[in-house]
């Protein structure tokens, strides 16, 4: 079925179209609301690597996106894609997948390169404990 980042989090605020969660040791993110959860509910944000953008710098003012900084911990070239393991500022490892066809390069970043990752608020799913 594929790979998935599992980020432990707590619901901070709920709403009809979005909810705010605090990803442990990382920060606040918005996601789709989950049925039956309320502020204080613990759970996991499931986020697929192909839903995560990675760049040396991303515009911070893009509506509906969540942004975090980190550095490239490792990468794995898989032909048409490269999987980057990004170490966030708190040490959490997150996998991001980047198509190699975007620029014809096999590798965009080297180990220890500073990067930003981002995903749309509706890219992940919050799974309550």
Task: Tell what function each PLM region has.
Residues 4-6, 10-129:
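Non-catalytic connector elements of ABC transporters
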């Amino acid at each position: 079925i594929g790979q998935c980042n599992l980020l432990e989090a707590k619901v901070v605020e709920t709403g009809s179209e979005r909810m705010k969660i605090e990803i442990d040791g990382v920060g606040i993110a918005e996601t789709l609301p989950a049925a039956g959860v309320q502020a204080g509910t613990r759970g996991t944000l499931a986020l697929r690597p192909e839903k995560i953008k990675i760049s040396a710098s991303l515009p911070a003012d893009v509506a509906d996106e969540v942004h975090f900084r980190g550095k490239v911990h490792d990468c794995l070239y898989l032909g048409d894609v490269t999987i980057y393991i990004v170490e966030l500022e708190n040490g959490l490892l997150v996998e991001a997948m980047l198509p190699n066809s975007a620029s014809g390069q096999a590798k965009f970043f080297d180990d220890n390169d500073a990067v930003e990752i981002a995903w749309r608020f509706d890219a992940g799913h919050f799974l309550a404990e």
